[in-house]
């Protein structure tokens, strides 16, 4: 890897996870960390807004970028669209999908996402693999 850029969003300052790890990443020379919260209280001194608002502020070479994300599906869809809109190939953008999994082998259908099963075909997919599925409201 060259530089690692972490865009981290949480609903509120109290909802942030891995605070010690975030602090250690912030101290590293090879990691750029940007943290934002959707809603802030009076003691918060950081950025306020959705994680997608961080995208225009980072510089990267689209052909040398690999993106990995987890979180709410709407956020991942928006960030993935923002990255591909800036030239990152959809096959280099990875999303960790979450579904209610029961059997874990694709039999029960609880985790079915269009034609794929998150339990056996994922849970990590490239944006290229599921971009069209993410646009369908019913799934």
What does each model-found stretch correspond to?
Residues 1-102:
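FNR/FR-type flavoprotein reductase catalytic core
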Residues 16, 105, 129:
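Short acidic, gly/pro-rich beta-turn/loop elements at beta-sheet edges
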Residues 73-75, 98-123:
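Local cysteine-cluster metal-coordination motifs and their immediate loop/turn environment
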Residues 114-139:
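Non-heme iron-sulfur electron-transfer modules
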């Amino acid at each position: 890897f060259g530089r690692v850029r972490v865009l981290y969003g949480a609903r509120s300052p109290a909802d942030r996870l891995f605070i010690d790890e975030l602090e250690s990443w912030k101290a590293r020379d090879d990691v750029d960390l940007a943290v934002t919260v959707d809603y802030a209280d009076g003691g918060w001194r950081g950025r306020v807004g959705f994680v997608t608002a961080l995208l225009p502020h980072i510089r990267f070479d689209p052909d040398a970028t690999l993106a990995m994300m987890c979180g709410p599906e709407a956020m991942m869809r928006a960030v993935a669209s923002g990255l591909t809109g800036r030239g990152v190939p959809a096959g280099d953008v990875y999303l960790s999908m979450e579904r209610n999994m029961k059997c874990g082998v694709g039999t029960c259908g609880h985790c079915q996402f269009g034609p794929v099963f998150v339990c056996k075909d994922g849970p990590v997919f490239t944006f290229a693999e599921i971009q069209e599925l993410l646009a369908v409201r019913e799934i």
